[in-house]
Amino acid sequence: MVKNELLECLLREKEARHSNGVIYYYTQTKMAYNSNRFEGNRLSEDQVREIFLKNTILSSNNIPVDINDIIKTINHFNAFNYMLEIAEEPLTEKVIKKFHFLLNRGTICEYTKDRIEAYINNQNMESILSEYAINILLEKYNTLIKKSLHDLIEFYMQFEMIHPFKEGNGKVGRLILFKECLNSGIMPFIIMKDFRLYYKREINDYEKKKRYLNEICLLSQDQYRTICKYFQII
């Protein structure tokens, strides 16, 4: 089972803090790089690896490095670790808020309320409606006994449409997808930055062309499955 073998391997390697050539290192660096790229992070993949392995960074061709990009990369590593630890627990509003907090801790976004006022503490009508919508979505989702990849993608798309946070909804949603894949015995996946324009376009047109997003996720799933086989995880 994907749930048993892959999750156990990721947790084992996380505790051992393995680095090169193993699935935990691959997943951490690939997901942090690609998911942050969707949100405008400008660090290169080599720089992300350098941060993960050595907690250092070298500028590329004397190009200034945005400290916010570094913090967001480290935050993604920490949020991914938390996701692994609670992968088999039910998906709740508390978990979603914790993902968002970990991803944005110490960044400009955390302190600039006019740029990111999450529904966590905001009590205006928009935030109240968002919180209500999230709770309804979670209630409906958690009644499903056996979840399919289609169910997970459907949840993600509705989460994106509710857009509970002013910023970072995509990164939170992609962590949710990975967590729920592990929890449901489904092969997880990392959506690479190469799909960015195609992926973003289909996000905005999901009701008409949702089959295309499913194809992106299935292709990404096949790519991750190939990596797992290469590392002899499955």
Tell me what each language-model feature is.
Residues 1-167, 171-234:
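FIC/Doc superfamily catalytic core
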